[in-house]
Amino acid sequence: MDLKQIEKLMIAMGRNKMKRIVIKREGLELELERDTVPSIQEPVFYDNRLFAGFSQERPIPTDQNLGNPIVKESIEKKESEAPAQGDFIVSPLVGTFYGSPSPEAPAFIKPGDTVSEDTVVCIVEAMKVMNEVKAGMSGRVEEILITNGDPVQFGSKLFRIVKA
């Protein structure tokens, strides 16, 4: 059996939707199989730039027809808890927020502090790696929106800044 015959067999398998064929003849054994799952899966990589415009905040479902008081109460509570408008420093990755370099050390920044673009404002731990987060803008820190040790998502608001 030569290569041309094997190619013809492969084409015939495709036309007839055959998954597997085994041929044994005159000391030759040939086994062809289609659409098999690979034994090793390729790793999947995600480009975080694709998610840059997405918000991590979820909309609160409303039930206007039923007048559900729990939903109305949660909407009113959510609106009152919403941080004031302004410029925000956001988390560049998913991890755990730390406001100081160690538990005993003072916080990197506090409300009222002035920051520049290169000022380290916090650390986000991801997979046991401590990643310094820089302000990326100049201004005065108005509010810290998260507490030490809290988990953060990509794009979570960390600090409210009034630009200088």
Swiss-Prot record:
Domain Biotinyl-binding, chain residue ranges per copy: 86-162
PROSITE patterns attached to this UniProt entry: BIOTIN, BIOTINYL_LIPOYL
GO cellular component, one term: acetyl-CoA carboxylase complex
A GO MF label: acetyl-CoA carboxylase activity
Keywords annotated in UniProt: Biotin, Fatty acid biosynthesis, Fatty acid metabolism, Lipid biosynthesis, Lipid metabolism
SUPFAM superfamilies given in the database record: Single hybrid motif (SSF51230)
Chain positions with N6-biotinyllysine modification: K128
Biological process terms in GO annotation: fatty acid biosynthetic process
Entry keyword annotation includes Lipid biosynthesis: yes
Annotated pathway: Lipid metabolism; fatty acid biosynthesis
One Pfam family linked to the record: Biotin_lipoyl
CDD domains: biotinyl_domain
Subunit structure, as described in the record: Homodimer.
PANTHER family, sorted: OXALOACETATE DECARBOXYLASE ALPHA CHAIN (PTHR45266:SF3)
Annotated NCBIfam families: BCCP
Role this protein plays: This protein is a component of the acetyl coenzyme A carboxylase complex; first, biotin carboxylase catalyzes the carboxylation of the carrier protein and then the transcarboxylase transfers the carboxyl group to form malonyl-CoA.
Protein name, entry field: Biotin carboxyl carrier protein of acetyl-CoA carboxylase
Protein's organism: Chlamydia trachomatis serovar D (strain ATCC VR-885 / DSM 19411 / UW-3/Cx)
Organism phylogeny: Bacteria, Pseudomonadati, Chlamydiota, Chlamydiia, Chlamydiales
